[in-house]
Curated annotation (Swiss-Prot):
Part of the 50S ribosomal subunit. Contacts protein L20. Signal peptide: none annotated. Belongs to the bacterial ribosomal protein bL21 family. This is Large ribosomal subunit protein bL21. The keyword Transmembrane does not apply. One of its GO terms (cellular component) is ribonucleoprotein complex. It comes from Finegoldia magna (strain ATCC 29328 / DSM 20472 / WAL 2508). Keywords: Ribonucleoprotein, Ribosomal protein, RNA-binding, rRNA-binding. InterPro entries: bL21-like, bL21-like_sf, Ribosomal_bL21, Ribosomal_bL21_CS. PANTHER family: 50S RIBOSOMAL PROTEIN L21, LARGE RIBOSOMAL SUBUNIT PROTEIN BL21M. One of its GO terms (biological process) is translation. This protein binds to 23S rRNA in the presence of protein L20. One of its GO terms (molecular function) is rRNA binding.
């Protein structure tokens, strides 16, 4: 059985036991969270929502809060000695999917 959930403006295909990396969620490690924006559930039969499946939810546990690898933004203008270097590390949350209720 798998489900497609929406969180942080992105969609993820999940099944029980999966560990996924999602946009930052305000929760501590060990907290239980629920995703109620379930777009599709598939098992023996397929339920597709419009836009979400009514009464469906996915239960998960927060494993960790981390930051992604650094990306470097470098701006310059040719022949003008204009240089700017900036870095960014996007925060994310590691989540373990525990149960899919359809």
């Amino acid at each position: 059985m798998f489900a497609i959930i929406k969180t942080g403006g992105k969609q993820y295909k999940v099944s029980e036991g999966d560990i996924i990396k999602v946009e930052k969620i305000e929760a501590e490690a060990g907290d239980k969270i629920e995703f109620d924006q379930v777009l599709m559930v598939a098992g023996d039969d397929v339920k597709v929502g419009s836009p979400v499946v009514e009464g469906a939810k996915v239960s998960a546990e927060v494993l960790d809060q981390k930051k992604d690898k650094k990306i470097v933004i470098f701006k310059f203008k040719a022949k003008k000695n204009y240089r700017k270097k900036k870095g960014h590390r996007q925060p994310y949350t590691l989540v373990k999917i525990e149960k899919i209720d359809a």
